[in-house]
From Swiss-Prot:
Keyword annotations of the record: 4Fe-4S, Electron transport, Iron, Iron-sulfur, Metal-binding, Repeat, Transport
Organism: Methanococcus voltae
Cofactors: [4Fe-4S] cluster
Transmembrane region(s): none
Gene3D superfamilies the record matches: 3.30.70.20, 3.30.70.3270
Protein name, entry field: Polyferredoxin protein VhcB
Domain of life: Archaea
Pfam families per record: Fer4, Fer4_7
Molecular function as annotated in GO: 4 iron, 4 sulfur cluster binding; metal ion binding; oxidoreductase activity
Length: 157
């Protein structure tokens, strides 16, 4: 199982506390059918799915790279790079357990693109309609969508 969080990761961060904790959304490569409901349900386009053969799936989430399952891993590099503090590390409580999340304040964002350039997962993007897309807000919609496929490839750890 690939744990898509900041565990065992910190070489790219500017400070020790800029990385998220060891909690996050986990992806089980063996169970995943690259079917795409998790990416379609994600309100912030934080998940990009390409099937194992490299063909793009018909969804809002697309990537030029083949054979990848990319999503925000809450590493916090975008938080460190943001000069206006529009991005901050925060917490969400689910089933009485605290999880890391990245919080975005659009009114502080000047669309400089520093977070987009530094993101190690290459999931952040700027556009005219929404100032910033691609960060995980821990809404858990991807997990619900994956559960409906009976594959349970995504889980909260």
């Amino acid at each position: 199982m690939n744990n898509l969080n900041s565990e065992n990761m910190c070489n790219c961060c500017n400070s020790a506390n800029s990385c998220g904790g060891t909690n996050g959304i986990s992806w089980d490569r063996e169970k995943c059918e690259y079917c795409g409901p998790c990416a379609i349900k994600c309100p912030n386009d934080a998940i990009m799915v390409v099937n194992p053969k490299g063909l793009e799936l018909p969804s809002r989430a697309k990537t030029e790279r083949a054979n990848e399952f990319k999503m925000c891993d809450l590493c916090g590099t975008c938080v460190s790079a943001c000069p206006t503090e529009a991005l901050q590390m925060g917490k969400i409580v689910h089933n009485e357990k605290e999880y890391d999340r990245i919080e975005f304040t659009p009114s502080l964002c000047d669309s400089c693109g520093a977070c987009v350039e530094i993101c190690p997962q290459n999931v952040l993007k700027l556009n005219e309609e929404y100032k910033l897309k691609g960060f995980c807000v821990m809404c858990l919609k991807c997990i619900d969508a994956c559960d409906k496929t009976n594959q349970n490839a995504l889980s909260l750890k």
